[in-house]
Amino acid sequence: MTAPRQVLPGTTYLVTRRCAQRQFLLRPSAVVNEVFLYVLAVAAERFGVLVHAFCVLSNHFHLVVTDPDAQLPAFEQYLDSLVARALNASLGRWEAFWAPSSYSAVALVSPEDVLDSLTRGPRAASSTP
């Protein structure tokens, strides 16, 4: 069993989550945009997470969030679960929506780390073969 994720109150994170088999399940569309925005807003409100930025690409998403109350795991579980259920239903799918590994959460210690994650995220992802 892996060690529990260390989640500290007040930490800012770069969170990334991939779709199963890197499928393009988050392709831009009105449904994807509406579902992701709505669920992200509800999850942030429910768990008190501050969303600074996000980027949804065709097969994964990035979030830059601050977690004042160490609620990141519950926030992510809620976000991922509802996005998967809604988009699977809209696509007529029943398979796993997200990759089997957990989300990635990298602590952003300095303001420079936050700016770097915001400016390099999509560019770095698009340069990966």
Label for each model-derived stretch:
Residues 1-129:
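Short catalytic/metal-binding and nucleic-acid-binding patches
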